[in-house]
C-alpha cells in the first residue's frame, strides 16, 4: 500500500519559497503535545467526527454493518478497531458530520495533482513541499518517485521534516530535494522525550548528516513558553551553539498556536496542550536578536 495523504493544500505561502502545494502525508513517529494535525499521527485511515454538525439522529448507529458506532454519554462515538472504512455512515449522514481522512495515490496521480498549479510555481519561484505527519518516515521508494518525477518536470521540491526517520532516508534524499525545512524543538533530551514521546538523538544526528552532504537547510523552531522558552533563554542558547557549526541557510521562529485544538475532538482524543503559551512579541524579538547575533538569517513566522 502506498503512503496515505490527508491533504493537498494549494496556494501555500508558509512552507518554503513562493506559492506552493503542500502534500501532507499521514503517519508520524512523534506525538508532540502541541501537534496541530493530530489526524496525521497514525499511518492508517481515520474517521473524523464533527459533533457540531451531528443532530444525534443515530442513523449511523443503526446502519453501520460492523457495529463500530455507538452512543456515548454526550456524543456519538466510534470504535476505530471495528471500523472497516466502508463509508456507509458517510452515505447516510444528512449533516455530513463524518469524513474519512487518508487517501491513497499512485506516484503519477499525485504528481498530476501537484502539476496543476505549475504556472503559480513558475511565476512565484514556488513548488511543492512534502510534509506530514512525517514524510521521511514513509515508503521511501514512493517518496523518491514523487521527488524525481517533480524534478523531471522542473518543479522545486522542499521536504518539511521533524528529523525522526532512518538516517539512510536523509542520505538518499539529500541530493535530489532542493530544500529541507527541518524542525528543531529541543536540545534537552529529557524534555524532548516528555513533550514528543521520543529522544532527539536521531533528529540531531540527521541534521548533521544533511549539513555534511551540502543540503540546503532552513531550521524551523516552534517557540513555546514552558517547553523551550524561559526567562534566561537557556534552551534557545543551546540550540544556537548546536547549530553554529552546521550549514544552515535560515532560521524560522514559529510562535506557538492552538488553532488545531478542535481537531482532537474529531478523533476522540484529549488535547494535552492546554497549559502551553505563545511567547510575547518582546520575547520573540529577543530570541530573534540572539540568533542574529550568531549570524543566522532569522525571521519570525514561516
From Swiss-Prot:
Keyword annotations from UniProtKB, A to Z: 4Fe-4S, Iron, Iron-sulfur, Metal-binding, Oxidoreductase, Repeat, S-adenosyl-L-methionine
Domain of life assignment: Bacteria
Residues holding [4Fe-4S] cluster 1: 28, 32, 35
Organism: Clostridioides difficile (Peptoclostridium difficile)
Binding site for [4Fe-4S] cluster 2: 54, 57, 60, 93
Protein name: Trans-4-hydroxy-L-proline dehydratase activating enzyme
PANTHER family, alphabetized: PYRUVATE FORMATE-LYASE 2-ACTIVATING ENZYME, PYRUVATE FORMATE-LYASE-ACTIVATING ENZYME
Co-factor binding comment: Binds 2 [4Fe-4S] cluster. One cluster is coordinated with 3 cysteines and an exchangeable S-adenosyl-L-methionine.
Record domain Radical SAM core: where: 14-297
Occurrences of domain 4Fe-4S ferredoxin-type (ranges): 45-74, 75-103
GO molecular function: 4 iron, 4 sulfur cluster binding; glycyl-radical enzyme activating activity; metal ion binding
Family: Belongs to the organic radical-activating enzymes family.
Keyword Iron applies: yes
Gene (name only): pflE
InterPro entries linked: 4Fe4S_Fe-S-bd (IPR017896), 4Fe4S_Fe_S_CS (IPR017900), Aldolase_TIM (IPR013785), BssD/PflA/YjjW (IPR040074), Organic_radical-activating (IPR034457), Organic_radical_activase (IPR012839), Radical_activat_CS (IPR001989), rSAM (IPR007197)
NCBIfam families: PFLE_PFLC, T4HPD_activ_SAM
Catalytic reaction(s) noted: glycyl-[protein] + reduced [flavodoxin] + S-adenosyl-L-methionine = glycin-2-yl radical-[protein] + semiquinone [flavodoxin] + 5'-deoxyadenosine + L-methionine + H(+)
UniProt function note: Catalyzes activation of the trans-4-hydroxy-L-proline dehydratase under anaerobic conditions by generation of an organic free radical on a glycine residue, via a homolytic cleavage of S-adenosyl-L-methionine (SAM). Is involved in the anaerobic degradation of 4-hydroxyproline.
Documented EC number(s): 1.97.1.-
PROSITE patterns: 4FE4S_FER_1, 4FE4S_FER_2, RADICAL_ACTIVATING, RADICAL_SAM
Binding site for S-adenosyl-L-methionine: 34-36, 133, 183-185, 257
